[in-house]
Amino acid sequence: MSRNENRAALSDVLQALQQEEVIAYPTEAVFGLGCDPDSEKAVNALLALKQRPWQKGLILIAANYEQLKPYVDDSALTDSQRETIFSVWPGPVTWVIPTHPETPRWLTGSFDSLAVRVSDHPLVQQLCSQYGKPLVSTSANLSGQEPCRTIEEVRIQFGSSLPVLAGLVGGRLNPSEIRDALTGKQFRQG
């Protein structure tokens, strides 16, 4: 840990991920809660902490598209659709892409698709690159509360035991835009 015990160094957060723990980290607009997408235990802990029903599905955030390919059905996309996606990545657009049948239900919820984003936040890029895979990502807030924008706000909502990657959120005021990769339909404005 660093001088301030409320802030974890990257190595501490990586260790927490390997131990199937939930972490908090800064993203483009707010702090996110994240965990290893391949750990059902970690995802269930995140859902319980967030007080979020599993049926809603989750978002994966990554350093690059290659990290997301094991979770989505890349063959469902046309070259034109891929071109559209890559034209705004890394960046603040989350795309909903069809999944493989073996993509875990704890990620997709009641859907046959998954929301994914390649982040342009330098700490998210570093975290996912060093971890070697994407992270589950959901805004750090309890149901009905405002999303956390500072480490202090994370501590108020979630307590002091949650590992929090030291850093600042990016300058964006709104969460990422969410679009359907096949139709272009907008689900959430960014």
Curated annotation (Swiss-Prot):
Residues 7-190 form the YrdC-like domain. Keywords: ATP-binding, Cytoplasm, Nucleotide-binding, Nucleotidyltransferase, Transferase, tRNA processing. InterPro entries: DHBP_synth_RibB-like_a/b_dom (IPR017945), Sua5-like_dom (IPR006070), TC-AMP_synthase (IPR023535), TC-AMP_synthase_SUA5 (IPR050156). It comes from the Bacteria. The keyword tRNA processing applies. It is found in: Cytoplasm. Its EC number is 2.7.7.87. GO terms for molecular function: ATP binding; double-stranded RNA binding; L-threonylcarbamoyladenylate synthase; tRNA binding. GO terms for cellular component: cytoplasm. NCBIfam families: PRK10634.1 (NF007919). Belongs to the SUA5 family. TsaC subfamily. This is Threonylcarbamoyl-AMP synthase.
